[in-house]
Every structure is written in C-alpha cells, then in structure tokens.
C-alpha cells in the first residue's frame, strides 16, 4: 500500500510539472493600457442603440453607429445571445451593534439549482461575498430598513453565517414562509452594478443593466455586450435572414476581478454554470455559415461545448470544463463529433437541456473551435476578458484599443460596442 502511495505522489508531481510546461506563460503586465476615469461610461446613453460601434475586419478599424450592426453581419451567419437575467443579488443587513454588513449572493448552495432556488420559500443557503465580514460575530442579522418600509419589514428577512472562508462565505437566509426567494430579492435586494462605476445603484440601472431579451434569472453581472440591442436592431437582423439563437451562462462576480498575479497561469477562474438545449446543438451542427457571438460570456459558453463533447466521448458524461483543459493536450475530434457526443448523451438520459459548468480561460494561443465574429464592449486593463480579445484578434488588441481611445469611444459596461472579425 505504501509503495502505491509513493508511486501516486510521483505521478502527481510529474503531472504537475508537465501541466506547468503546457500552460501558456503570459505576463499580465503586457495587457495593460492607460484608461482614464473620464473614459469609463458611468451611465448608459439615453437610447440603447445610439452607442458608437468599432468595426475591426481584415486589419482595418472603422467607426459606425450601433444601428449599423445588422448591415455588418455576414448574410450566412448565425448570431448567439446569452439570455441570462441579472438578479438583485446585493443585500444590506445590520447587526444589533449598528454595524452594516453587505451580502452579495454569488451562487446557490441549497437548493443548488437556480430554478428551485428562486421558487423556494422560508429559507435557503447561498455562497456569498460578505463585506465587513470580520465584524460579523456569528449573530443573526436583520435586513437594513432605514425608512421602515412596511413591505420590506413584512419579509422578516434574516441572515446567519454558516461557513466562512478566505474569499466567500455560506449564508443562510430565512424569511416568511409564503414568499418565493425571487420575490424577496426583488423587494429587498439591489442590482449589483460594477464597482468601477463608483456609484450606488440607481433607478435607471433596474432597466438598463439588463438586456431586452434577458430570460433566465441567475447572473450577478450583465452580459453587457447585449445591452445595446433594441427591438429595431433585432428586427433588422431577422429581416436580413440571419438566424438568432441563445445560450444561457449565469455570469459570476469573477467578471469584476482583475488578474492580480503577475503570471496568468497563477490566476484562478471561477466556475460559471450554463445551459444549452439539444435542439440548439442540432441547429449549431447544421449551420454552415459564420458564427457570431454576442459577448465574451457567449464565447466562453460556445467554446466550452467542444470540451464538454470531448468529455462525453472519453469519460461518458459532460464533466465541467477546467480552466486549462484546452491547453494541456491536443484533441483529435472534430467539432461535429464533439457536439454529436453531447446530443447522444442527452438522448440516452432523456434530457432536453444540458446543465454544465465552465472555468475555461481563453488566452493568446487558444485555438477557436466555433466563434468567427465577436460583438463586445471595451474591457478593463489586465483582465481575463482583454486576454480573450487578444486571443481572438491574434495579438492585435492594442491597435483596436488605441483606435478606441483616440476616437472618443466610451469604455466598460455602459460604454460603446465593437464588432471584431477573426481572420
């Protein structure tokens, strides 16, 4: 038995060394640029589709309006949106001592499924980020209600700290039995707008920090590339004969986190759950033209499907996609083989929907399997999203961002848009 353990330890050490050799060695300082605070859009424009649109194609960068988007899409393309819905996941509590504790709901723990979580009554548990957590001495917190709002008071919402870790905590919420948790959040919570806006959530954010096509509750950050789309723009896309489809990835708070380590290989990606249907996978296989992804969350979902398919082929089930799975070895399967493997698994299990998770990080050197065109906003310096843009443009991100900075484009969540063509 002892010999087996020694062999196992040696194997793990060798595997770790080999893995480090295969992971791209990328210094995050190479993906920095000067972003003045005045270039960060703190509020949305009056009209969603009145934003500017940068087009990068064949090495050329040009300025359009977002209403020009449909005319720039290839006629044979299929455009994919992320139809997740942002939930008012930020809650403010108060200790009896008067200390304020902010709780940011990240991921359901009990019930674990999002649909069940939002329907549950009486109590539930979430993985959370807790502000001022050191001041929370394991006592029960009451919801902060400074204006004695009767509707909020009637909820009788309380919070108990169940488990504390370095970055997150498990919190149990209790409230009156007759109301689903989705309604509790609607009444008691606030929309968690990005911290770089440097302001509190306002009435305008309830509508504008949400896409028009948002459908399934679960995100704590909006898939902001979709904020520009209006019914008029969508109708123009349909009139061009372009197929519109959706995936659903619930965006986590990790989207706000910069890469703090000097080497990207030392950065840890958070798991994000996603859902696709078998019918969508069949349409994806049948599509012969260009694939347009709206937002980096759609890209990560679509590109993860290949590795989910590989897991179905090699392991017999759709194991979550690991952060470095695309880089650790070569995979000899075609995209069609991978997608068909997922469908076969779903058919065998009688599933209409596949629920899976991904930690995939897309960095320079990544081999794109599905996405040809990307619609996206302008991202923070030294972020994993900027690494994705660099990977997509094969290193030409600086040209695009220099052009945007030099031509008065607005940056980040409420900023302007871009459409990028991968050559």
Stretches with model-predicted labels:
Residues 22-423:
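Surface-exposed, charge/polar-rich loops and edge strands
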Residues 7-9, 13-18:
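Short, positively charged and aromatic/hydrophobic N-terminal segments
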